[in-house]
Amino acid sequence: MSKPDSIVSVKSFKMSFGGKTVIKNLNFEVKRGEIFGLLGSNGSGKTSTIRALLGLYQPTEGELLINGKKFTPEDGFVVGYLPEERGLYRKEKVIDVMTYFGELKGQKNPREWALNYLKRVDLVDKANEKIEKLSSGQQQKVQLGITIMNDPKLLILDEPTKGFDPVNRKLLMDIINEVHQKGATILMITHYMDEVERLCDRAILLKDGKARAYGTIKDIKKEFNDISLDEIFVKVYGEQDA
């Protein structure tokens, strides 16, 4: 059976919490091999959409599919997910945690891979430190490494560079782009429009639980008379929300 052109499909998706509807009839697809931006102000439904896609939330209505079917725990070996909330074994050493997850994910040389990655992100001197001794940004780098270490076919990232300075943001964007160059499809949430400009092929802007704009970056700009993505964000969500 041939694989569908879209690795992610969201159809007629509706999500309600406590009687309040936060997602209203949302439809979009992520094409195989692209980098797709899921954009919106705080509370627009981005994270809820990802969690429903991964089976962490039950949609009120609609269908959310990965590779043409609902997500199951077994799909975790081909889907890498970096959540907004970072959760690691805080009392364990960095290298031990990375090696453990590498073994779970089928990485052939997990310890060697982990050390090479830690060198890349300037954390090799922290390899034998306990996770709890690391800053939040350092923990975020470690968790990104765990997420990508088995070359997932689909990489889902919820604000992967949040809180980083420009140098480290660029470093992480370079790493994410390298994963993409190896063949991964990437679905990412970000509030940094320069990342969207640099990385994303297409994007969707959510507002009030619905799609405000959807398409290639060029098409979205054209819809707003070719202003910048930052200007579009302010125009759509208002200066107070942005």
Regions found by a protein language model. Name each.
Residues T99, E103, N109-K126:
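Conserved ABC ATPase "signature" region
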Residues L155-E159:
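Catalytic Walker B motif of ABC-type/P-loop ATPase nucleotide-binding domains
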Residues V196-R198:
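A short, surface-exposed alpha-helical micro-motif characterized by mixed small hydrophobic
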Residues Y214-G215:
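ABC ATPase "signature
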